[in-house]
Amino acid sequence: MRIGHGYDVHKLVEGRKLIMGGVDIPWEKGLLGHSDADVLLHAIADAILGALGEGDIGKHFPDTDPAYKGADSLKLLEHVANLAIAKGYCLGNLDATIIAQRPKMAPHIPAMRENIARVLRSTVDRVNVKATTEEGLSFTGRGEGISAHAVVLMIGKG
């Protein structure tokens, strides 16, 4: 068994879609980034890569590589899942937290969990996603950005 932790943050800007957990969330702003800037999936990918001892998403998907411009983070997470499988690991469980003042994430969490479980070839009961605010404090509390943390337990198959 191996444990990994991931964290990601992106700035909120006008003129971008807000994608979280592979779900397009209707909102006046979106996250700025080289890919679709899905902080939840990026944190999860980082956690899995950490558990595998494989660095981070910047190593695997550099923001200097035009191949990842506008990339769908579900595809990036799928690549990480395939790497885990190739190394003989599967998801034991995942616990993630989105930190955002607005918009409310709760209505979208079931769809996020389904997307994540599907891409990781797991079941929804092994994927937990929750959301919180920072009560108006810090950059997320002021609505300047959104961040996410993820912790994974990866289980060796052999």
UniProtKB/Swiss-Prot annotation:
Concerning SUPFAM superfamilies, the annotation shows: IpsF-like (SSF69765)
Q: Which reaction does it catalyse?
A: 4-CDP-2-C-methyl-D-erythritol 2-phosphate = 2-C-methyl-D-erythritol 2,4-cyclic diphosphate + CMP
Q: What is its EC number?
A: 4.6.1.12
Look up the record and name the cofactor or cofactors this protein needs: a divalent metal cation
Instruction: Give, as one word, the top-level EC class.
Output: lyase
Q: Where does a divalent metal cation bind?
A: 8, 10, 42
Question: Which pathway features in its UniProt record?
Answer: Isoprenoid biosynthesis; isopentenyl diphosphate biosynthesis via DXP pathway; isopentenyl diphosphate from 1-deoxy-D-xylulose 5-phosphate: step 4/6
Q: Which Gene3D superfamilies match?
A: 2-C-methyl-D-erythritol 2,4-cyclodiphosphate synthase
Give binding positions for 4-CDP-2-C-methyl-D-erythritol 2-phosphate.
8-10, 34-35, 56-58, 61-65, 100-106, 132-135, 139, 142
Biological processes per GO annotation: isopentenyl diphosphate biosynthetic process, methylerythritol 4-phosphate pathway; terpenoid biosynthetic process
State the oligomer form and interacting partners. Homotrimer.
**Could you identify this protein by its name?**
2-C-methyl-D-erythritol 2,4-cyclodiphosphate synthase
Source organism: Pelobacter propionicus (strain DSM 2379 / NBRC 103807 / OttBd1)
